Amino acid sequence: KLAPGLYQYTAVDDCTRLLVVAIYQCRTAANTLDFIERVVEQMPFPIQRFQTDNGREFTAQKVQDLLLEWGIKFRPIRPAAPHLNGKVERAQKTVMEEFYVLVDLASADLHDELEQWQFYYNWQRVHGSLNKTPMERCCELFPITPFSEEGQALFDEDREREFHRDRLLNRYLKK
């Protein structure tokens, strides 16, 4: 939560650190679906897996149905374990330190400014652990990146299951 009525959704590719960010007025399944579509559209490779916290906006049936339909594995982290989502947590900190300190959250242009900053982050900003930009890393890995058909061949819908916010129910359904 950035401010009242202002929430940031963040996706980070585990390997390249490519970043997709968007701002919404609330955390809902509908906004999550919109964000997933945005991520799939903006990432230059097929998405194989979504890892999230256990927020209701991510565990909603509509969200899980879309991921299953698109052949994307859904992997929520354990409750109260934000360290398991470390790359996203770090990316959010970077956005706070490098973007939000420079802008007015009430600006009518906030969404456009965030998109411009995302472009800067992915194409121009050298990432500390990679010593290159996320897009440079992506181009470096492109020859060995699986295409959509290859990723779909690895997806086994029968091995996927529904996740619930209730850990006991999840444990029961896992058996």
Region roles according to the model:
Residues 1-12, 18, 31-34, 160-175:
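Mobile-element integrase/transposase regions
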Residues 22, 48-53:
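Short catalytic-loop micro-motif centered on adjacent basic/acidic residues
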Residues 18-22, 76-77:
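Short small-residue beta-strand/loop micro-motif enriched in glycine and branched aliphatics
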Residues 38, 65, 69, 119:
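Surface-exposed charge patches
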Residues 70-72, 94-175:
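C-terminal domain-tail junction helix/linker
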Residues 21-45:
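Active-site beta-loop-alpha junctions of metal-dependent nucleic acid enzymes
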Residues 16, 56:
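Short, glycine/acidic-enriched loop or turn micro-motifs at the edges of active sites
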Residues 52-54, 60-68, 74-97, 108-115, ...:
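RNase H-like two-metal-ion nuclease catalytic core shared by retroviral integrases
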